[in-house]
Each structure stands twice: as C-alpha cells, then as structure tokens.
Regions:
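Non-globular, low-confidence helical/coil segments that flank catalytic cores
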Residues: 1-223
C-alpha cells in the first residue's frame, strides 16, 4: 500500500533528506506502480530511469505527466546501461522491452537479479541466465507465474536465496505450484508469509531480515 511503502522509505532515507537520487521504473504494470504517483510527491526523485510502455497503465501515465510538470529528467532504459554506485558496485539493465526491464545489482561479491519486467523473448535474450552467471539473490518474475519462471533459469543462476513477492490470497492463484515444485531444495522467502524482506550486504556478507516473523535474520557469507 501507499502508506506502507512511504513508511518503509522513511525508515531508510536520512531524516534531513527526502529526495531520491534515482527512481528506477522497471515495469509499467498497474499493480507495480499504483502506489508511486503519491509517493513521488513526498520523495521527489532527481532522475528517473524508465523501462516499459509509458501508456502501459493509468499510474504510468500519471507518473509521466508528473515528471514532465516537475522537469524531472527521464532516461529511457536500454540493455547495458549502468548506474555506478561506487567501487565495483552498480545497477545494470540486463534486458529492456515494452513490459519493463531486468536489473542486476552488484556490490563487491554480492549479485542480485530482479526480472521485474519480463516480456516475450526476454529470458531467451539472456540465455535463461547463462549470460549473467551465478547470483546470490533472485527475485521471481511476475509473482511466480510459471511461463516467466522456467526451471532453466534457476539452474543457470543457482541463487542462494529466492524471493517471491506476492500478495496473500493472490486473485490469480499465484505462485504457480509448478514453480514452487521447481524450487524444491532452494532457500525461498515469500512476502505473503514474511512481509517486507530486506537484504543487506557489505559486498562480502549478506544478511536477510524479515518483518512478520519477529526480529529474525540470516547471515550468509558470499563467495
């Protein structure tokens, strides 16, 4: 919800600064963006990296209009673009298309793949993960929709942790049972069971904090 997202951002941003250096829009689906039009009024981005069809949803159109009215620079995402975050730390666009983009986050030895905007041919263009290599964290695409999460991508990426972002009682019945079956043997965390999932890394170690099961965390050494 808008209030939950606003609260979580407030906890993570410095009290004296409510601006974002960059806002990355990796999908223009309505369910992905519905909270953002009100959020960006409170946390104003200095720059926007935009993936996907601007006319793809009502919220996407609202955001496009707001950025234009506020003279906020918007860059269209393309495969290979990179936001440098520091020494050996970056966010890179692995693929981009009408539905959005696939993001790779790297910080030292830590790597996370976020296939947020997967469309037709996206996974094929990435050789089902072979062109990316091993990652530590993988976000399931499309809340665990089977065609967006073939078993090959799990085998090729070999993630230490798989994160499933899905609402409790998803109206489409997601995640697909076939996807969950394919993940047997992998470490999986689900937002419908654990709430907000936070992954923290210094580039050598990774800590995972989960919200709904008390102050629990897992520490993982990256190799």
């Amino acid at each position: 919800s808008t209030s939950e997202l606003s609260d979580e951002l407030g906890r993570r941003l410095p009290f004296f600064s409510r601006k974002l250096d960059w806002l990355i829009i990796a999908s223009t689906d309505e369910e992905q963006l519905s909270a953002l039009p009100r959020i960006v009024e409170r946390y104003v981005p200095e720059n926007v990296l935009w993936s996907g069809n601007v006319q793809g949803s009502f919220s996407a159109q609202l955001l496009d209009k707001y950025f234009a009215e506020q003279d906020i620079p918007v860059t269209r995402a393309e495969a290979g673009q990179r936001l440098e975050l520091g020494e050996n730390s970056f966010i890179e666009i692995q693929a981009a298309g009408p539905r959005g983009s696939v993001l790779l986050i790297q910080d030292g030895n830590f790597r996370a793949l976020l296939p947020i905007g997967v469309g037709e041919g996206t996974l094929e263009s990435l050789e089902f993960g072979n062109s990316i290599g091993k990652v530590d964290v993988l976000l399931l695409a499309d809340a665990g929709y089977a065609p967006s999460n073939p078993v090959d991508i799990f085998e090729n990426l070999s993630p230490q942790l798989v994160v499933l972002s899905v609402a409790a009682g998803d109206p489409q019945g997601l995640p697909d049972p076939l996807v969950l079956e394919s993940l047997d043997g992998y470490s999986v965390l689900r937002t419908d069971r654990s709430g907000w999932i936070t992954v923290i890394t210094d580039g050598n170690e990774m800590r995972v904090d989960i919200a709904l099961q008390g102050p629990k965390s897992r520490d993982i050494l990256l190799a």
